[in-house]
Curated annotation (Swiss-Prot):
It is found in: Host cytoplasm; Host nucleus. Belongs to the herpesviridae UL32 protein family. InterPro entries: Herpes_env. This is Packaging protein UL32. Residues 287-391 are annotated as: Zinc finger 2.
């Protein structure tokens, strides 16, 4: 079957490749918290846990080698091997389409796992004579390699004039991730103003008519994978998914690996742009609404309908949270899915069946989207639409007409060739803006010591101005940075 990109037909909860990627997106369990160790350090149990914590830090250091600026990109190395062994151009054309889709995708855990799985499927499909087994098992690849290649450094994109400017952005971006994973007490001190002054917006140089031919909708439905990925974690703390969490744990444990006991309570957190599992004031570090809009056209349209309805709800000066509550109540009352979906018990069977659906000329809502709206509630919608710069950057980035569509079969190959030779992957959000946003998110999940408090104060002055310059319509980040995650 011809590769079309972002096609859920090639994904399932039982897929060995998909589950292997999920497995290696989990961190190992770290025993007890370091604060507990300090309370009573002399017990045998705490000594054992201290050793385990040391071993886990060593494992993290191994994983985070992908975040060293002077370390090779392992994805690029694999691509180089493939280019030397290909007998035709079919592989590179498929890879170009994958990059084209990636460029139109938001930065979400679901997007990362789709990109990683499709990349692995492509190299296995095109190079039967090369053994790609054990890439994760033998530490040749890690999940962070996909972050670096496709999202942080964007190795596939065409270069700008200032190579060292780009190098420094990548360096600082990786330093933030590394400090979070290694639980450093302080975040790297980054002056975003110098990047703001040097950053140059990319402009489209030329067009190609065939790139406008994506007119056929793909049968894309990834929503069930969201529930599978995050079942049994605090991301779904209002929705019980016990059976699904047990099924996932059994499947992952059956995969041969050298990993220790998985931290299942955090889930596949290495897929997240901010790999820290935390909840705060009815929000979580993984935004389920960003995941939802990544999953299908109908879910993207549903969120667009909710946003438009909130903005246009009435002419009175209602607060946004009140508008959201009224719109959400009206929508759920109209759909009435809640009459058949009881969220007081385990919802695993409901997720797997997904039998209830309501649609009209404005939106479609099914059991999956209903449960996610139930989980996030009005506060989650408020944070997603109006407060979180990462969510708003994702909304600006996603291009559903690229992500969820394909061309007619007769021109699909020409379409891939056009992408490859045009080699133009334009940013909706510039790299220095992504860096600043991830700096912001790092402050949200880090411990507030004296040094970090000083950094936050200086950072917010520049960050607020940067968002204004980039036309981010957003609630004052000074509120969000301390109140949500």
């Amino acid at each position: 079957m011809a590769y079309k990109g972002w096609n859920s037909d090639s994904f399932s909860m039982n897929s060995e490749l998909f589950n292997e990627i999920l497995l290696y997106a989990h961190l190992d369990s770290s025993g007890i918290d370091s604060d507990d160790l300090n309370t009573n350090p002399n017990t045998l149990e705490n000594e054992i846990n201290s050793v385990e914590k040391t071993l886990n830090i060593e494992e993290l250091k191994k994983i985070t080698t992908a975040l060293n600026i002077d370390n090779r990109c392992n994805i690029c190395s694999i691509i180089n091997i493939c280019l030397r062994h290909e007998t035709d151009k079919m592989w590179i054309y498929d890879y170009a389409l994958l990059c084209y889709k990636c460029n139109a995708a938001p930065r979400t855990p679901l997007a990362v796992v789709i990109i990683a799985t499709e990349f692995m499927q492509l190299i296995q499909k095109h190079f039967l004579n090369i053994n790609f087994d054990g890439l994760f098992l033998n530490n040749i690849l890690s999940i962070l390699d996909f972050h670096v290649h496709f999202f942080i450094n964007r190795c596939f994109s065409n270069t700008n004039d200032d190579l060292l400017h780009n190098e420094n952005i990548t360096l600082y971006h990786m330093a933030i991730l590394k400090s979070l994973l290694l639980e450093d007490e302080s975040i790297p001190n980054i002056r975003i103003k110098k990047f703001k002054l040097k950053g140059k917006p990319t402009k489209k140089q030329h067009g190609n008519a065939i790139l406008e031919k994506q007119t056929l909708p793909l049968n894309t439905h990834f929503t069930h994978l969201i529930f599978y990925m995050w079942a049994g974690t605090n991301i779904f703390d209002r929705i019980s998914l016990t059976d699904l969490a047990i099924k996932k744990r059994q499947i992952l444990k059956a995969i041969y690996s050298t990993k220790n006991e998985l931290n299942c309570s955090a889930g596949p957190i290495l897929l997240s742009q901010i790999p820290i599992s935390i909840t705060k004031n009815a929000t979580s570090s993984v935004c389920l609404l960003c995941e939802l809009m990544t999953s299908s056209q109908k879910n993207f349209d549903l969120l667009q309908f909710i946003y438009t309805s909130v903005i246009n709800y009435c002419q009175n000066n209602l607060k946004m949270i009140d508008r959201i509550q009224f719109v959400l109540a009206n929508l759920l009352d109209l759909a009435r899915i809640y009459t058949n979906v009881k969220t007081t018990s385990d919802c695993s069977k409901i997720v797997l069946a997904n039998e209830q659906e309501f649609s009209n000329s404005d939106f479609v809502i099914d059991c999956h989207s209903f449960l996610i709206l139930k989980q996030v509630g009005p506060v989650g919608l408020y944070k997603h639409f109006f407060c979180d710069p990462l969510c708003i950057a994702n909304i600006k980035t996603i291009k559903p007409h690229i992500l969820f569509y394909t061309t007619e079969s007769c021109i699909l190959q020409d379409f891939k060739v056009a992408i490859c030779y045009q080699n133009e992957y334009l940013n909706s959000v510039e790299k220095h803006v992504w860096l600043a946003i991830h700096f912001f998110k790092a402050f949200q999940v880090s411990k507030l010591n004296h040094k970090n408090k000083t950094l936050i104060s200086d950072f917010l002055k520049d960050f607020t101005q940067l968002l204004a310059d980039q036309n981010f319509e957003i609630v004052d980040p000074t509120f969000t940075i301390h109140y949500y995650v």
